[in-house]
Structures are given as C-alpha cells and as structure tokens.
Amino acid sequence: MFSPLIDQLINSLRHLPGVGPKSAQRMALHLLERDREGAQNLSEVLAKAVEHVHRCQQCRTLTEQALCNICSNARRNRKELCIVETPADVIAIETSAVFSGYYFVLLGRLSPIDGIGPKEIGMDVLASRFAEGEIEEVIIATNPTIEGEATAHYISERAKAQGIKVSRIAHGIPIGGELEYVDGGTLAHAISRRQEI
Amino acid sequence: MFSPLIDQLINSLRHLPGVGPKSAQRMALHLLERDREGAQNLSEVLAKAVEHVHRCQQCRTLTEQALCNICSNARRNRKELCIVETPADVIAIETSAVFSGYYFVLLGRLSPIDGIGPKEIGMDVLASRFAEGEIEEVIIATNPTIEGEATAHYISERAKAQGIKVSRIAHGIPIGGELEYVDGGTLAHAISRRQEI
C-alpha cells in the first residue's frame, strides 16, 4: 500500500521478534517522519554488530572482543563454572550478584529433532575445559524444559566422568510467589523435591 | 552489562516506538543469535529508506518517488481532496475503499505550543492547490482532538474563502460498537450531532 521502499522497510522490521504488520508499519513511519537520525544510527550500529559480534573464545557468549568482559576478568572464581543456554541468562544471573565464577553459554540446548547435537552446543570446547582440571564445581542452569533437562543430564555425565562436582539450580515456588497462583507442574516438583529443615 | 557494541545496539533499538529495554535486549540477541541475515537486510533497507524517502511533491505523504502512487494515478477524482494528518491515515482510508479522490497529508497538526504553525503543515502548498480551482470538495479527516479540530477549522476557513465546499468526516458511535462501552465524550458528541431520519 505504501511506496515500494517503505513496504520493504515494513517487511524488514518484521524480522524483529514480537513485531507484527501493524507495529512494523508504526515503527517505519515513526522513524521516517520523526526520527531519521535514530534510523540512521540503528542502521549503522546493526551493520557494525553483524560484522563484529561473534562468540567469546572461552565461554561462547556474544561479544565483539576475543574474550568477553567476564572471561577477561582474572579476579573471578576459577573453580566454579555455570552453564547457561543464552547470553541473556548470563546477564540475568550477573544481575542477581550471587555467582562469582565463570560461565559457559551453550547458545541452545540438545535437540536431536532440530539437528542440535553436542557439537552445536560447543561440547568439545566445554569438555576441554573440564579436562583442564581447574574447575571444581559445575552449576547447570539450563531451562527446566525437556530439552534443557536432557542437556543438563548429558553435561553432568561428562563432568562427573572427569571427577567434577555437578549441581543443578533449584526449581520450585518463586520467592514472593503465592501457592494459589503457581502452576501444577511447578507445585508437584516443589513437593517431590521438598527438603528437610 | 553486555559488550559495548551489543549495548549500543540495544540502545539504538530503543529508538523504535513501543520498545523498552527488555524488548530491545530480546531483539538484539534474537538478531545476533538467530537472524543475522535479517539484521543485515534491515540495516541496508533502513539506510536506503533514510536516504531516498522524502515527501510527495503534491500531497506530502512519504514516498521515494517524486509523486506518490496515488498522486501519479490520473484516473482518480480530481474534484475531491481528503486532508489527513499522517501517511498511515491515507492507508486506512484507502483500505476502506470509499474514497476515490486525492489526498493531502499535513504530517502533523496545528499546535502553536510545539511551534507547529501553518507553514509546518504545508498550508502554502495546500492553498495553492485550493487556488487552482479544480477542487470542488475538501473532506477534512484530521483526528478529533483539540489540535485536530483547530486544524480542521483553520483549513475549512481557507477553503471556503476560495468558494470550495468543505466537509468533515462523521464522528460518533463506531459501527458494530455497543453504547454501553462507548466513552462519555463520544456519546455526548453522538447525541448532540444526532440526525433526523
């Protein structure tokens, strides 16, 4: 309905997650009518990010440096390694400020049906870190989904084979949550994994 | 929290309307983890759009051509001119398929407090179209806000001075709407502007 170039921009904006045709139209017109500088800036930063952002050599998170901020910080605890699925998970745990070790980002989870095997989640890199002998505890923080649990199981077997202690983050009722509003699956898990006090 | 370039990308994405810090983070990671081609494409189309999209010489809507699709269509009704605030309004009216004349896009509305006067809404261009003598009816479809009404009043005075018939689109209860859920302002307007049947 718009001119070809504007239609093309609307279509390109739909690559963004959670953006449907109406939002994409609103975004395109907003940028062109009122924020051309912002549009120009977004275009340049996007191109730069696509060109320069790659995976951290050590933990596989996304970064434009050879080593990410966390891996290049020598003052963290070398004995603990936390394994997560995505870079956003690293930020979530960092924000909670309870973990001072290093991370390893799988950038996915084992899912044979989607063709994601040990190689795709960087198991070779992870195995060589296990073999270095510096790590004393591996904390597995993959999501509590079927694939996440399978991934956790697979990694824990590999770590235990190297004599490393393995733990899984706790799942149950969120702090401040009310039982009444918690889903059945979580509640069942919380009861079966109850701990003596 | 992320590496500088990723943080910069997240900030740039916040220029998009309706995108807060969480959505911007999700968008940035989605593009970098899973859709680099889409990101590259968006960057290129954005740069091209910022460079080439300007205002249609005749109706002031956004287009990369000298004249937009509608203005360059000689088979429309030259006697009717519909005045709207934004390019999105043109598309909305075109979709309803009840109007076959030409448009004029103000790209805003009179708002002295924001420094938007007759010049900013292209009143000089519009006045010269009124003066051409081809237009028989001007349909004013600015939004029913205080500024939109003031703009409608101002334009109608200018058009009437040239002997052109002026009309305003109808405001009232939306078709298919239920009185119970219509706001008081709309209901008051609908009652005071009731029409004999």
UniProtKB/Swiss-Prot annotation, chains A, B:
Q: Has UniProt tagged this entry with the keyword Metal-binding? A: yes
Instruction: Pinpoint the Toprim domain residues.
Output: 79-174
- InterPro entries (UniProt xref): DNA_Rcmb_RecR (IPR000093), Rcmb_RecR (IPR023627), Rcmb_RecR_Znf (IPR015967), TOPRIM_dom (IPR006171), TOPRIM_RecR (IPR034137)
Q: What SMART domains does the record point to?
A: TOPRIM
Q: Which SUPFAM superfamilies match?
A: Recombination protein RecR (SSF111304)
Pfam families to which the protein is assigned, alphabetical: RecR_C, RecR_HhH, RecR_ZnF, Toprim_4
Instruction: List residue spans of C4-type Zn fingers.
Output: 56-71
What GO biological process terms does the UniProt entry carry, in alphabetical order? DNA recombination; DNA repair
Q: Which GO terms describe its molecular function?
A: DNA binding; zinc ion binding
Q: Which keywords does the record carry?
A: DNA damage, DNA recombination, DNA repair, Metal-binding, Zinc, Zinc-finger
Cross-referenced PROSITE patterns, in alphabetical order?
A: RECR, TOPRIM
Source domain of life: Bacteria
Name the protein family. Belongs to the RecR family.
Protein purpose: May play a role in DNA repair. It seems to be involved in an RecBC-independent recombinational process of DNA repair. It may act with RecF and RecO.
Task: Tell me what this protein is called.
Answer: Recombination protein RecR
Q: Which organism is it from?
A: Saccharophagus degradans (strain 2-40 / ATCC 43961 / DSM 17024)
